[in-house]
C-alpha cells in the first residue's frame, strides 16, 4: 500500500453527489433500502447521534448496549453502526464472523479512546510494574480501542461502563491491591472516590512524559489514573454550575461522571447516559434541570419533555464533533453500497485482539 493510500483511503471519501441531494430524497432512499433489506439490515444509533440519523436507528442506546443488541441480532447480515470507531469495534468483536459491521464514516473516532494507544500502555505497564510489582489490575472504560481492551483481557482485567463502574472497581480490588484505570481519569477518579478511596491515594500516569504524577509516598497509592479525558465533558466547569445556582436556584444539576471531579462534586446528581435519561423521565412536570452531557442528547431530551424546563449546563456547548461525522449523507452512502452488493468502511478486528478483548468484556458481563 502506498503512502497516499494510507493517508487518504478511498473508503472515507463521500461521493460528491451526496452533497447535492436534498434531505427529502436522502430520507426517501434510506427508507426504501431499509424496507427492501428488512431483517438483513440492522442500524444501531448512539444517544449522541444527530436526529437525522437517530430517526432511522433500529435501536438507540449507549455503546455497550448497542454492541450487545447487535450481537443478539442473528438475522442481520449487515450492521451499520451509527456511532464512533471503538463502538463499531466492540460490535464486530461480539457478533458472528458472517456478520459485517460497517461504520458510515471512518473519520468518526473518539479523542478519549485515542488518548491511550497500545504502545503507550505497554510501556506504562512495564514502568509501573517496576514500581509496584504484581499488585496491579487494569480496568478500561469501554470507550477505548480494541487493543486496550485486549491488553486488559490478557492482564487479568476487565472493561467497565459508566453504569457499572462502581461494581467493577469494587471487583478489581478483590483481585489486586492497586487499580490502573484507562483511559478516562475523571470516570476513574469519581468512581473510586464514591467508593471511599481518598483523592490523596490516587496518582495520575502521564503517557506523554512516561511519568507518575504524585506527591506522596507511592506505597500509599491505590488507584493509578490514565491522563485522558472526554473532550466534550471537559467543557463543563464549576463556573457553569455557579452561574446556574445564581440565576436558577431551584434548578437541579445532573452531569455525566466523565466530567471532572470538581464538577461532579458540585452537582446534585451524576450518572451514566441512561441514568440521566431515566432521571429526567421520572422527574415531575414543571421540574427544572441543567444537564451536563453531549448536546445532541440534551436537545433530544428537551424535545421529549416539553413539560419540564431543561437547559444545557454549559450554554455554549457544542455536540461531539467526531460523533457528528455520522450524518444522513454518509448513512445513505453506506446503505446504497450494501444495496449494490459492495462493502465499504468494514470494521474487522484482528482475531487474537478479539479473543483477548472479549475476555475483558466477559469478565464485566459476568458480574453486572
Swiss-Prot record:
- Keyword Metal-binding carried by entry: yes
Q: What is its main location?
A: cytoplasm
CC cofactor note? Binds 1 [4Fe-4S] cluster per subunit.
EC number of the protein: 2.5.1.72
The encoding gene: nadA
Protein known as: Quinolinate synthase
Q: Which GO terms describe its biological process?
A: 'de novo' NAD biosynthetic process from L-aspartate
Residues at which [4Fe-4S] cluster binds: 110, 230, 320
What does this chain do?
Catalyzes the condensation of iminoaspartate with dihydroxyacetone phosphate to form quinolinate.
Q: From which source organism is this entry? A: Bacillus cereus (strain ATCC 14579 / DSM 31 / CCUG 7414 / JCM 2152 / NBRC 15305 / NCIMB 9373 / NCTC 2599 / NRRL B-3711)
CC per GO annotation: cytosol
